[in-house]
A protein has these predicted regions:
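Noncatalytic, basic helical substrate-engagement surface that gates or grips nucleic-acid strands
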Residues: 1-77, 81-107
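Non-catalytic nucleic-acid-binding/docking modules located in mid-to-C-terminal regions
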Residues: 2, 45-47, 66, 70, ...
Length: 214
């Protein structure tokens, strides 16, 4: 196991999209002052405590989980829906929905039953619907139902836009207008776009030993 935290400072997403997480309230003082204690707790429990500058905790978590699941079953615990795109054989996700009172355990089958398409299309879904929590726009007017319907048929944005002429007029215009945003978001919302070999060789910017997923 491991505890993964955001490092201080901006990430590559802030450089790519200036309004990323704009308007989000800062961490409450009561929580911020306890962060060093959480790091110490991880060390006392024998858990690697991991953070890396320039990326988010999700990036570290995703890269670590994908590397580890090649050798052993992995369970990711998170409140962030973005990490559902990690789902694959040997990797499940527990998503906290209401603080620590309600959880959903996802595998590929549970995800597909809920969304109607496979997990490897989830970042395309996020590109279409956007993410209000991160102040990231989607394709205006497509919405949740429209995105699900498209991704039941198409494997991703490339296929959707290659087949643009076949979409009904109103939907086609929405997709055309939103294409610049849609084409930004898949990589922008990808939580594991890290080269694992470089990731491990450079170690991680954390104050403790971070030999994760050995």
């Amino acid at each position: 196991g491991a505890l993964v935290f955001d490092a201080p400072g901006p990430t590559f997403r802030h450089e790519a999209y200036e309004a990323y997480k704009e308007g989000r309230a800062p961490m409450p003082d009561a929580l911020r002052t306890q962060m060093p204690l959480l790091w110490e707790l991880g060390e006392l429990l024998g858990l690697p405590v991991v953070a890396r500058g320039g990326v988010e905790a999700d990036d570290v978590l995703g890269a670590t989980a994908l590397d580890a699941c090649q050798r052993q079953p992995v369970l990711v615990v998170t409140g962030d829906k973005d990490l559902l795109q990690l789902l694959r054989p040997g990797l499940r996700v527990v998503r906290a929905r209401k603080g620590v009172s309600e959880f959903t355990l996802y595998d590929e089958e549970v995800f597909r039953a809920e969304y109607g398409f496979p997990p490897d299309r989830f970042r395309e879904y996020l590109a279409l619907v956007g993410d209000a929590a991160d102040h990231v726009p989607g394709v205006a007017g497509v919405g949740d139902k429209g995105a699900r319907k498209l991704l039941e048929t198409y494997r991703g944005l490339e296929e959707i836009y290659a087949d643009l002429e076949r979409h009904p007029g109103a939907l086609r215009r929405k997709l055309e207008d939103g294409q610049p945003v849609a084409e930004l978001d898949p990589d922008f919302k990808d939580p594991y776009a890290l080269d694992w070999s470089k990731f491990i060789d450079g170690r991680l910017d954390a104050p403790y030993d971070t030999g994760v997923a050995k």
